[in-house]
Each structure stands twice: as C-alpha cells, then as structure tokens.
C-alpha cells in the first residue's frame, strides 16, 4: 500500500528522472580519428601542451568534439603522459 501511495505521489517525477538519465551519453572512447588529430597536436606541442582557446575551438571543429571534451582530453593527457622538463 505504501509503495502504491509513493508511486502515485512521485511516479511522474521518477519517470522524468529515468528519462533524463537515459538521455545522458555513456562514457567511452573518443572516435579514433579525433584521438589521432589530438595526438598529432600533442606531438607538435609536447614541450608546452596547453592549447589556446582559439586552438581548442579549432580542434573542436576539426574533430567534431565538444570544447569540454577537448579540454578534458588535454587535462587527462598531461596528467598521464607529460613530464615537464
């Protein structure tokens, strides 16, 4: 009985949450071509791998990724693979 009362009261809200969660993208690897383009930039700028905002926008456009994905890729790449001189 309590379950039914709660479902009646909050059912719409829960359905909305369920739908919202199902819309979210699943985590996964970036497309291979995008990774290759980012790695190419990385290799050319290894000594100082901090792209400017303009470079990030250009990379986002050429890779088809969001600027936030570009930003996160560089943060992770520097953390995992960059040893400043």
Swiss-Prot record:
UniProt organism field: Zea mays
Cellular component terms (Gene Ontology): nucleus
PANTHER family: HOMEOBOX PROTEIN TRANSCRIPTION FACTORS
Main location per the UniProt record: nucleus
Taxonomic classification: Eukaryota, Viridiplantae, Streptophyta, Embryophyta, Tracheophyta
ELK domain mapped to chain residues: 1-21
UniProt GO MF annotations: DNA binding; DNA-binding transcription factor activity, RNA polymerase II-specific
Subcellular location: Nucleus
A family per Pfam: ELK
Protein name: Homeobox protein knotted-1-like 8
Keyword flag DNA-binding: yes
Function: Probably binds to the DNA sequence 5'-TGAC-3'.
Keyword list, A-Z: DNA-binding, Homeobox, Nucleus
Family: Belongs to the TALE/KNOX homeobox family.
Source species, domain of life: Eukaryota
């Amino acid at each position: 009985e309590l379950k039914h009362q709660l479902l009646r009261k909050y059912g719409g809200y829960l359905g909305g949450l369920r739908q919202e969660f199902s819309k979210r993208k699943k985590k996964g690897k970036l497309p291979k071509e995008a990774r290759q383009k980012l790695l190419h930039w990385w290799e050319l700028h290894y000594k100082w791998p901090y792209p400017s905002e303009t470079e990030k926008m250009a990379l986002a456009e050429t890779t088809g990724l969001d600027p936030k994905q570009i930003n996160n890729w560089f943060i992770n790449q520097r953390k995992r693979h960059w040893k400043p001189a």
